[in-house]
Amino acid sequence: MASRRGALIVLEGVDRAGKTTQGLKLVTALCASGHRAELLRFPERSTEIGKLLNSYLEKKTELEDHSVHLLFSANRWEQVPLIKAKLNQGVTLVLDRYAFSGVAFTGAKENFSLDWCKQPDVGLPKPDLILFLQLQLLDAAARGEFGLERYETGTFQKQVLLCFQQLMEEKNLNWKVVDASKSIEEVHKEIRAHSEDAIRNAAQRPLGELWK
């Protein structure tokens, strides 16, 4: 009998919505309750591609928009062997951003269609659950360190949010919207409940492929 696979859970949202905080809390809580769980963050900045992206995000270098979109996708693809291996070992993975951020942030730029933006990520491991942390842009901008990295401007984040809203219309993906303006503990409780459901369901079905 095949061992139960772990769930692939993604945290998405505009910048400073609390994804990293909630990802860490979720992994800690899942491990405390007997699950095997780990956190991965995208971009994964330790690889050669990731270092290039880190320099770009910190505004130290400039890259052409099409090229940088493909690099973000490549950064996800280079983690696919690890993701699949962990899931097959029964480890639940919590991802701080994934392909949806890649599509939304490029789609927010001029002259990019969402269809074009999706293409490089077609076939990535399909998440069992995507948690969108909903936060008013003014509230996000008021949170610490907003504006330090590229893309952290109110005007651009508004366009990003519109792209996310279009992505959430897809019926074959398991999106759950969470009100991130609530207290950290309230948000965590809701995320935890959705995640426990996803873990139970993932154990009964094979891993899918994104946008296929």
From Swiss-Prot:
Gene: Dtymk
SUPFAM superfamilies referenced in this protein's UniProt entry, alphabetically: P-loop containing nucleoside triphosphate hydrolases (SSF52540)
GO MF terms held by the record: ATP binding; dTMP kinase activity
Disulphide-bridged cysteine pairs: none
Pathway as given in its UniProt record: Pyrimidine metabolism; dTTP biosynthesis
PROSITE patterns noted in UniProt: THYMIDYLATE_KINASE
Similarity-based family: Belongs to the thymidylate kinase family.
Organism: Mus musculus
Oligomeric and partner information: Homodimer.
Name by which UniProt lists this protein: Thymidylate kinase
Domain of life: Eukaryota
